[in-house]
Amino acid sequence: MDKIFESLYKAGCDVRMFEKLSCHTSIKIGGRVKYLVLPNDVFSLERAITVLKDFPFQIMGLGTNLLVQDEDLDIAVLKTERLNQIEIKGEKVLVESGTPLKRLCLFLMEAELGGLEFAYGIPGSVGGAIFMNAGAYGGEIGEFIEAVEVLKDGRKIWLSKNEIFFGYRDSTFKREKLIITRAMMSFKKEKKETIKAKMEDYMRRRLEKQPLDLPSAGSVFKRPREDFYVGKAIESLGLKGYRIGGAQISEKHAGFIVNTGSATFDDVMKLIEFVRKKVKEKYGVELETEVEIWWNGRQW
């Protein structure tokens, strides 16, 4: 038996060899990975990282803001979807990193804790959202963080909010490549009916404006400044519906690239670079990608 496979299994993880990541990303693109590792709890995640100390690995939440190369990757991917426990402590909530944001929002609604309604419908995990400081409709997840537990140099440590930097789609965790395991978040009491109404309103807006019927990796580009709307800029260039191979600029929202059924990593990357070039020519603005890209087993 493969020694790394055996050690990961003994560490309390389920392990799949040569698993296609296209089955684990929302855009349905991605080659085979040598080890797909599913830790069953925070402790098995810790042990898995120890096993992989001399083998390259990446952390994956729900794969919703991720673009992965088509070629096989000689790495391990630790997918945190089973780290999904939520514990309420008054007006504070302790939540594990693999918890889907939607599930956390529904939990908060039942507990009558308000504030995170804007995140209902964002399809990622709590850990991924904290990592990139996800936000929508004027809210960002970093506003609700009291402390975050991370794995750093083989040790579990808690960082308080005063030790954490949050910026626009940016954070300490992203800059320092820290592995998020749990977060303590703080909310305010709110009536269930009010929370539900807000969540339904945000979801209605998403359904109206975003291409939720086709595979995508979410919003592709960061907004370069507050008054520059990327989707509108791309639309003004007449690029809605423009496609390269199976990758297409969404006809519903030009800030999204969708997989029409046969898109490859190269199709999407070429389309990203084409859009960046056209926006630079017209507006003099350099677009940065919001989507995380794995190429040659590393973040691009």
UniProtKB/Swiss-Prot annotation:
Its EC number is 1.3.1.98. GO terms for biological process: cell division; cell wall organization; peptidoglycan biosynthetic process; regulation of cell shape. Pathway: Cell wall biogenesis; peptidoglycan biosynthesis. Gene3D superfamilies: 3.30.465.10, UDP-N-acetylenolpyruvoylglucosamine reductase, C-terminal domain (3.90.78.10), Uridine Diphospho-n-acetylenolpyruvylglucosamine Reductase, domain 2 (3.30.43.10). One of its GO terms (molecular function) is FAD binding. It is found in: Cytoplasm. Keywords: Cell cycle, Cell division, Cell shape, Cell wall biogenesis/degradation, Cytoplasm, FAD, Flavoprotein, NADP, Oxidoreductase, Peptidoglycan synthesis. The keyword rRNA-binding does not apply. It catalyses: UDP-N-acetyl-alpha-D-muramate + NADP(+) = UDP-N-acetyl-3-O-(1-carboxyvinyl)-alpha-D-glucosamine + NADPH + H(+). Its cofactor is FAD. Residues 28-190 form the FAD-binding PCMH-type domain. GO terms for cellular component: cytosol. NCBIfam families: murB (TIGR00179), PRK13905.1 (NF010480). Belongs to the MurB family. This is UDP-N-acetylenolpyruvoylglucosamine reductase.
